[in-house]
Regions:
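Small beta-barrel nucleic-acid-binding modules, primarily SNase/OB-fold domains
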Residues: 2-147
């Protein structure tokens, strides 16, 4: 009888450890979409496609592709997060759809927040006009660049 109780206790401990160690899914802030997917295209320095869905980097603006600096911004993103990489996209709760039907969000790839990386590298600028309408405006990186 005593060994049966210990057996059950051990099983419960193992189950508890399993739920602590195994993550329950992607971790995002807010209530909007939180998706994990594969990068299918790097459009430019502030837009990628994830499983075919266009994602615009929240609070980040890079030059257009017809400008040399736009090409450099795209190359920067490609180095960190090449096509085929798995990304986590945290959709901006306060901007659930941007221009051209793109989702707007914070993108994490290979341990890097792409929004922040583009700004840190000097390939982009903070979009200050959205600082009052973005969930991410109070992030450390957004504040550092002018939100």
């Amino acid at each position: 009888m005593l060994s049966k109780k210990y057996f059950l206790l051990v099983i419960l401990v193992i189950i508890g450890i399993f739920f602590i160690i195994i993550p329950s899914g992607p971790v995002c802030s807010g209530e909007a979409q939180c998706i994990t997917g594969k990068v299918t295209k790097i459009v430019d320095g502030d837009t990628i496609k994830v499983d075919g869905t266009s994602i615009r980097f929240a609070l980040t603006s890079t030059p257009e592709m017809y400008e040399e600096k736009g090409v450099l911004a795209k190359e920067h993103v490609e180095k960190i997060c090449p096509v085929g990489s798995t990304v986590l996209v945290d959709e901006d709760d306060m901007q659930t759809e941007g221009s051209y039907g793109r989702m707007i969000g914070l993108i994490k790839c290979n341990g890097v927040i792409l929004n922040e990386s583009v700004l840190e590298s000097g390939h982009g600028e903070i979009s200050t006009r959205y600082c009052k309408t973005s969930e991410f405006a109070n992030s450390e990186w957004a504040k550092r660049f002018g939100c």
